[in-house]
Structures are given as C-alpha cells and as structure tokens.
A protein has these predicted regions:
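Alpha/beta-hydrolase
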Residues: 200-363
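Catalytic nucleophile-loop/oxyanion-hole region of alpha/beta-hydrolase
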Residues: 84-118, 420-428
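N-terminal cap/lid segment of alpha/beta-hydrolase-fold proteins
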Residues: 24-48, 346, 419-425
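Short beta-strand/loop motif that positions the catalytic acidic residue
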Residues: 368, 373-376
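Conserved alpha/beta-hydrolase
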Residues: 68-88
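Primarily recognizes the serine-hydrolase "nucleophile elbow" in alpha/beta-hydrolase
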Residues: 110, 116-190, 347
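Catalytic active-site module of serine/aspartate enzymes centered on a nucleophile-bearing elbow/loop
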Residues: 404-406, 410-442
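Short beta-strand element of the alpha/beta-hydrolase
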Residues: 48-58
Length: 442
C-alpha cells in the first residue's frame, strides 16, 4: 500500500510538472533499488519498446526529470533514478554511485522486450554515466589507476555494459566546473575577507561590470585561470594531508572531517555563487564558443554548420552570492571533496589533468567504445567543453550538435531572445534529435 501511495504521489507530481506530455506517461511506477530510488516510465500506447534509457545524476533529484516524460512519450522505457547520495553533497563517495547505475541497468534488462540500454547523462549525470561505462568496458583497472586522487573498490568489477550514451549539456567533470567557479583572490582559507585585489573578479579595475557583461583582459584571464588552479591544488594538498593523518590515527576523527571552501560557489552545485569569468563575460570564446564549425539545430528544426557561440546573458549578480554562506560556500567532507570535487591542474582553462579524478567525462570517454551523442545547449556554458570531450572520445560512432537558444535544463532562454518565441522549440528539438539518433542505431 505504501508503494501504491507513493506511485500516486509521483504520478501527480509528474502530471503537474509536465502536463503537456503527461498523456504518454500516466502511470509511472516507483521502484526501490537498494539504496537508490527509481521511477519507471512507459509509453501508454504504441509498439512494445525494446530500448530502455537510464537517467541519473550524482546527487540531484531526477525522478521527474524532463527526459523521463519526453523520452517515454517517444516510445522508450525510461528509468529515472536518484543515487544513494541524493541531495547530499557532503556524503558523496563518487565511485559508489556506479553501483546504483548498475542496479538500474540490470533492472531494465529484466523488463520484457528490452534488448538495448542507453545511458542519458545530463549535467552531472554525464560523468556519472561515462564513469560507469568506462569501468564496464575496461574493468576496475580504469578506476584504480594510481594517478587518481581516489580509487574504486573491486565491487565495481563486472558491471553490465550499456549499448550507447547520450550526453546533454554534459559537465566535463564536476571537479572541473568547481575549479572554474572558484574565486582565486582568497588569501586565507580561514578568512575569506582577505583578498588579493589584483585577482578580484568583482573589481571594476579588473574588468567587472556590475550592470552587464564584464570585459577581462587576456592578461587578467591568464593570471586568473592559473590562480584558480593554485587555490584548488592547495585545498587538495590540505585534504590529502588530513586523510593521511586519519589513516595514521593522528587526527581526532578517524574516518572523515569537514572541508569548507568559502567563495567557492553554490553548495548544492546549482547556479549562483560562482566566480566563473565566463558567467560574467559570456563572450569568452575560449569557453563559450566552438573552435570550428559544428552543427547548430535551429529553432525550426533545420540544421546549419557554423562556428557557434553561446547566446547566454551575463550574471553580474554573482558578486553578492559569491560572498554569501548559503549560496557561495562549498561544504564537503574530506572524502566527498577528494572523490567528487577535486582535480589537479596548472590552469583552469586548458591545463587540467582530467584523469586525476574518476569524476571526469573527459577522461572516461577516452576509454569508451559504444556510440555516443553529444548535445550542448546554445544558451549555456558547456559548448566548448562538449566539443572538446567529443573530440577526445574514443568511440568511432559519435555525433555532436548544439541546440539553439537552450538553457542548461533544456528550456528556452527567454532573456536571450531578440524576438518573442525565438527559441521556443528547444525541448522538442533536443528530444527529437536524440530519439532519431537512438532509433537509427538500436
């Protein structure tokens, strides 16, 4: 009875959230999967599906993610999951999340008629799914590389492989996004009020514009990116030293301890609180534009090939949130920081040693062979990162396109529009393209 009650609650939640598409998923089923949670979405009509799609993030609630309804109404069985660490960044042990993906893959494989499994990695779901598949294809040697800041256990041996992956506005790795959001002007981790004014991104002398797009000089950008890496490396060194003290029994706590990063960005990983230059200056081509002509899916569904720049608007208001506790301060444990949020680098732009972290889409895709689709959102911040990840991917069957005018959650960027409705079809275009790509292969 409790399961039925929760099913009814979820059905109501999904109907309210996505009423325009609810006819295709009128009876989602809650599925407990050990420490993970899941909701199964099936088409109400049409041919019996043979493709199952797994949707999950490392900590976000994806039980009613837009992909659940959009894919199921297009004829797929979709399992939308929450990991064992849902809504709890402090508790994350990154490598364990692959066990939750495994449970989802195995569950879908047991469903009648399902012969193919596709992983859907949106945002932080991208490193989640790519890590899983890299270990599934290569074994635990991939995640036990001594280069990693943390390694996996042998319980990840024998993960069942998926047949393909769709990456949608993928994080290149969560540690990389954390790194680029750091405010590197902090001089003392115990006193965030002490700053190096020459590195302050919110100082007009350095190019900050409180009323619109900022304009940082190439010289400032270079120093800033290097200083972001220097700060990350210092915090890593502190955490590693503390981990060793705990191992030796020389610390009060023998298992774990707190890591607080002031002016480091939103503690729940969402928008706000960051000191990312590309958020303040969206015209930053090194991050916000493709390096060469790529496919752009226009609002009318047509496709053109051109150099693509994000149409994102600046967010100068991050000055206030970056200085706050609730939105601008990261709160981790030593374990969650090192496994889920840390990466070595010499500069945050192009000097990142991606494979020092197991939480890295960029690292994982270099060891994955199944077909991969990369879709970047044209009004978000991951256009160049997605292109770079696509270029490095080992798969011989891969595709890359940008959805014009789409925000990170796939919805239209209304403030970016020059005319009302200019980007009205972002959701349809994304899921139509992904559906055609999946059906053509599986």
């Amino acid at each position: 009875m409790k399961v039925l009650g929760f099913r009814a609650f979820l059905a109501g939640l999904c109907l309210a959230a996505v009423s325009a598409t609810a006819q295709a998923q009128s009876n989602p089923l809650y599925v407990p999967l050990g420490p993970a949670k899941a909701v199964l979405y099936k088409p109400d009509s049409g041919p019996a599906p043979h493709i199952g799609i797994v949707v999950m993030h490392r900590v976000a609630n994806y039980l009613s993610h837009i992909a659940c309804t959009e894919f199921s109404k297009r004829g797929f069985v979709v399992l939308c999951m929450n990991s064992r660490f849902d809504n709890n960044e402090v508790r994350v042990v990154w490598e364990q999340i692959a066990l939750d993906v495994k449970a989802g893959v195995e569950y879908l494989k047991r469903q009648p008629g399902i012969t193919k499994i596709v992983l859907f990695g949106h945002s932080g779901g991208a490193p989640t799914m790519s890590f899983y598949q890299a270990v599934a294809e290569n074994g635990v040697a991939f995640c036990q590389d001594p280069k990693r800041l943390t390694t996996c256990d042998n319980n990840l041996a024998g993960l069942p492989k998926a047949d393909g992956i769709v990456f949608a506005d993928a994080h290149p790795g969560f540690p990389m996004t954390i790194l680029r959001g750091f405010n590197p002007s902090i001089l003392d981790e115990n006193d965030p009020g002490k700053v190096d004014a020459s590195l302050d991104p919110f100082d007009p002398k350095n190019g900050y514009n409180p009323k619109g797009a900022s304009n940082y000089s190439p010289e400032f950008q270079k120093r800033y990116f290097e200083a972001q890496s220097a700060r990350m490396n210092r915090i890593i060194d502190r955490a590693l030293a503390l981990r060793e003290k705990m191992k030796r029994g020389e610390h009060y706590y023998k298992d774990n301890d707190i890591v607080i990063i002031s002016r480091g960005g939103n503690p729940v990983g969402g928008p706000g609180g960051v000191a990312s230059l590309h958020v303040l200056q969206p015209s930053l081509e090194s991050i916000m534009s493709t390096a060469r002509p790529q496919k752009l899916i226009k609002n009318d569904g047509s496709i053109v090939t051109e150099v693509i720049s994000s149409v994102a608007v600046p967010d100068p208001g991050t000055r206030e949130t970056n200085m706050s506790f609730d939105v601008g301060t990261k709160v981790y444990s030593v374990v969650s920081f090192l496994s889920n949020n840390a990466v070595r680098s010499t500069n945050s732009l192009d000097g990142i040693d991606h494979c020092t972290s197991n939480n890295s889409t960029v690292c994982a895709v270099q060891s994955i062979t199944v077909p991969e689709l990369y879709l970047a959102m044209g009004a978000a911040n991951f256009i160049r990162d997605t292109e770079m990840t696509f270029d490095l991917a080992k798969s011989s069957d891969k595709d890359f396109a940008v959805i014009e005018g789409a925000l990170h959650p796939f919805t239209p960027c209304r403030p970016c529009e020059k005319t009302p409705g200019q980007y009205s079809n972002t959701v349809k275009n994304l899921f139509d393209y992904a559906t055609n790509w999946i059906n053509a292969r599986f």
